[in-house]
Amino acid sequence: MLCPAWLLAVAVVGVVRGVKGQCWENPRCHDLSSENNLLECIQLCRSDLTTKSPIFPVKVHLQPPSPSDSDSPPLYLPLSLLSPSSPLYPTEQQNSVSPQAKRSYSMEHFRWGKPVGRKRRPVKVYTNGVEEESSEAFPSEMRRELGTDDAVYPSLEAGTAEGGEAEGMEGVFSLQEKKDGSYKMNHFRWSGPPASKRYGGFMKSWDERSQKPLLTLFKNVIIKDGQQKREQWGREEGEEKRALGERKYHFQG
């Protein structure tokens, strides 16, 4: 009696073959009562598949591997040996490694990949109820307590009790305005220079500009003109006196 695995192998070969020109039409595959006839039929179907396999007009390394390769198991073996647990595929089980078992990539060559030294230890913040858990790990002076001191941080309720409800609301609105407004870089010296120093002082209006240089210019021009006029008047007076002296000398002679 034939094993069901052999019959299943023959059925798989017949299904892969297609509708037209099946290998079952061969007289060797009509009588499957013996094991020899069954093996001959399987070999015939295999040879028919290899001869009629499509040939791709591409390079050799891009073509699909033929079923006659050494790495593919023979078709006449039982299907129980084709399972992944069979010893025919030992390398695939060794090469298949779960992604969880792979080591994570640590970017140690970047300065933010792995902190060095004491930077690895996170800063722990303790409340009043959790201080007893790690009292031995950290000394008392290194702990940061999150205490709520009413003297340092007055609550809004105290302000409302004293009639300062408007002040509390103004503080809330001021915070909201800071969030909604544009960010001003006041801590940089180029954020908002005074108007007198913007663009070297050339973009100021006429009223904003200092008028001292203009007044000094007018004053210098007036003084210079006055000096020139006085010199001219002095020369004219000298010429007149000289002319009068010549006339007196002429009349006396």
Swiss-Prot record:
Stretches that traverse the bilayer: none
First and last residue of the signal peptide: 1-21
Lyase found in the keyword field: no
Cystines in this chain: 23-45, 29-41
Region called Disordered, residue ranges: 228-253
A molecular-function term among this protein's GO annotations: neuropeptide hormone activity
Any matching Pfam family: Op_neuropeptide
Free-text description of this protein's post-translational modifications in UniProt: Specific enzymatic cleavages at paired basic residues yield the different active peptides. Acetylation of beta-endorphin occurs in a tissue-specific manner.
Top-rank taxon: Eukaryota
Tissue expression pattern: C-terminal peptide 1 and C-terminal peptide 2 are detected in the anterior part of the nucleus lateralis tuberis of hypothalamus, in dorsal hypothalamus, thalamus, telencephalon, optic tectum and medulla oblongata (at protein level). Expressed in pituitary and hypothalamus of adult diploid animals, and hypothalamus of triploid and ovulated female trout.
GO CC, alphabetical: extracellular region
Modified residues annotated as Valine amide in this record: 116
PTM annotation (N-acetylserine): residues: 104
Subcellular location, record wording: Secreted
Keywords: Acetylation, Amidation, Cleavage on pair of basic residues, Disulfide bond, Endorphin, Hormone, Pyrrolidone carboxylic acid, Secreted, Signal
Positions carrying Pyrrolidone carboxylic acid: 22
First-listed, main subcellular location of the protein, grouped into a coarse class: secreted
Any one GO biological process: neuropeptide signaling pathway
Modified residues (Glutamine amide): 252
Function: Melanocyte-stimulating hormone alpha: Anorexigenic peptide. Increases the pigmentation of skin by increasing melanin production in melanocytes.
The family this protein is said to belong to: Belongs to the POMC family.
Protein's UniProt name: Pro-opiomelanocortin A
Organism: Oncorhynchus mykiss (Rainbow trout)
Taxonomic classification: Eukaryota, Metazoa, Chordata, Craniata, Vertebrata
